[in-house]
């Protein structure tokens, strides 16, 4: 009788843990990049001017907070047929080089997304922006189109490129 009760309980506990462990080893990754005719400093300035996001950013349509390690941001995304607000924690903020944050859905381990922006100096006042995200968590294998963000990343990259290049010409 006890085995009849414990077997379903064990399955309910083991399956989510196993799926979570699997996604830690096999995360879902999204990566985009674009070359920009602007210095890494100018790209960083545009990327971290959160107050201006509503003017130009088609993906992260608003962002509040400070780009500093440990800070909590409030970001509102547009895409996949709707909007979503989330509050990631900044993991890295190196001016002209890297901005990285960790966002979580509901609680740690359900769906975790580590989002990053890397800025590479190509010389001659040019940069490469790499934007990506690594998704892990128990629901990642079942999230389907909810994690299809590559088009949103690419749209943001193109808009950031246009804004940074325009700002670079004004200097």
Language-model-derived ranges and their functions:
Residues 42-47, 53, 73-75, 90, ...:
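Hydrophobic pocket/interface hotspot
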Residues 2-11, 16, 20-25, 64, ...:
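Hydrophobic-ligand binding "helix-grip"
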Residues 2-68, 159:
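Hydrophobic ligand-binding cavity/cleft-lining segments
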Residues 2-9, 13, 128-171:
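A conserved amphipathic terminal alpha-helix motif
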Residues 33, 63, 80, 109, ...:
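A generic helix-loop boundary/linker signal
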Residues 50-92:
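Extracytoplasmic/periplasmic/luminal assembly and interaction segments
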């Amino acid at each position: 009788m006890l085995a009849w009760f414990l077997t379903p309980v064990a399955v309910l506990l083991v399956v989510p843990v196993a799926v979570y462990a699997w996604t830690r080893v096999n995360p879902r990754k999204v990566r985009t990049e674009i070359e920009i005719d602007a210095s890494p400093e100018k790209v960083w300035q545009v990327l971290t001017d959160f107050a201006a996001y509503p003017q130009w950013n088609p993906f992260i349509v608003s962002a509040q907070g400070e780009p500093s390690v440990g800070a909590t941001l409030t970001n509102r995304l547009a895409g996949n047929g709707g909007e979503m607000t989330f509050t990631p924690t900044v993991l890295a903020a190196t001016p002209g080089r890297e901005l990285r944050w960790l966002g979580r859905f509901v609680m740690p381990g359900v769906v975790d997304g580590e989002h990053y922006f890397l800025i590479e100096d190509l010389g001659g006042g040019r940069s490469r922006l790499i934007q990506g995200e690594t998704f892990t968590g128990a629901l990642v294998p079942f999230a389907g189109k909810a994690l299809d963000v590559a088009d949103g990343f690419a749209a943001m990259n193109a808009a950031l490129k246009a804004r940074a290049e325009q700002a670079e010409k004004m200097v």
